């Protein structure tokens, strides 16, 4: 960890991390019934995360949002993360865990949270296990070819930012000619992201299944049908 950090940032980070470890509430008290949500890109996690928050009243904890907030606040942990982000590097797991520990001390986390976008790897799941009690894990599962169809078919109106889809949400004929495909929506990019997902994140399904925590959701259906499956899963959890 030491290469990028200035001595001041490194020292302040260690102080903050020690404070987090000292003040973290006992497991089972601060993290009653936390939920992990994961699935491949384009599986509809964002939509279903909103549904889970509505059904459970648990706050959504996104590492992306936490990183942006920490950097904006200028906190020691945020400064540590910013050095890596500015260098175009992934923020190390121990910094992410430190940010999560801080988030779990907030009052609204007392009855558990919804982890969205974390963990992404088994080592991250092992680290999370040390600071949070995860009571259930929801995996939204969609075949690769369906994911490719969903994402590659997206088109954006550069004038309004509105997203259309060549099959599922066609644009009005009068604006079709100005629609563009975003670089992240090309088939090459999507399949590369899916490969990374299968190598790094998909193994979490078996890891959590071995612990009796996994709930698999068929995400290859309409938004409403997936939502019904999620609601049924939540009713079993609560």
Predicted regions and their residues:
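Glycine-rich phosphate-binding loop of ATP-dependent small-molecule kinases
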Residues: 2-238
């Amino acid at each position: 960890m030491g290469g990028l950090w200035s001595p001041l940032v490194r020292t302040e980070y260690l102080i903050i991390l020690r404070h987090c470890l000292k003040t973290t509430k006992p497991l089972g008290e601060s993290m009653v019934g936390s939920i992990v949500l994961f699935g491949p890109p384009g599986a509809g996690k964002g939509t279903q995360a909103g549904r889970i928050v509505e059904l459970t009243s648990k706050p959504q904890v996104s590492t992306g949002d936490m990183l942006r907030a920490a950097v904006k606040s200028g906190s020691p942990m945020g400064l540590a993360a910013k050095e890596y982000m500015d260098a175009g590097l992934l923020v190390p797991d121990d910094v992410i865990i430190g940010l999560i520990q801080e988030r779990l001390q907030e009052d609204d986390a007392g009855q558990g949270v919804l982890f969205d976008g974390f963990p992404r790897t088994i080592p991250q799941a092992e680290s999370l296990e040390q600071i949070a009690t995860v009571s259930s894990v929801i995996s939204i599962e969609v075949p690769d070819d369906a994911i490719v169809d969903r994402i590659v078919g997206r088109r954006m109106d550069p004038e309004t930012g509105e997203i259309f889809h060549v099959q599922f949400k066609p644009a009005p004929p009068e604006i079709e000619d100005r629609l563009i495909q975003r670089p992240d929506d090309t088939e090459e990019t999507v399949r590369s992201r899916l490969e990374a997902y299968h190598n790094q994140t998909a193994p979490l399904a078996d890891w959590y299944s071995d612990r009796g925590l996994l709930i698999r959701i068929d995400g290859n259906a309409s938004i409403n049908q997936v939502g019904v499956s999620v609601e049924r899963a939540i009713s079993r959890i609560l």
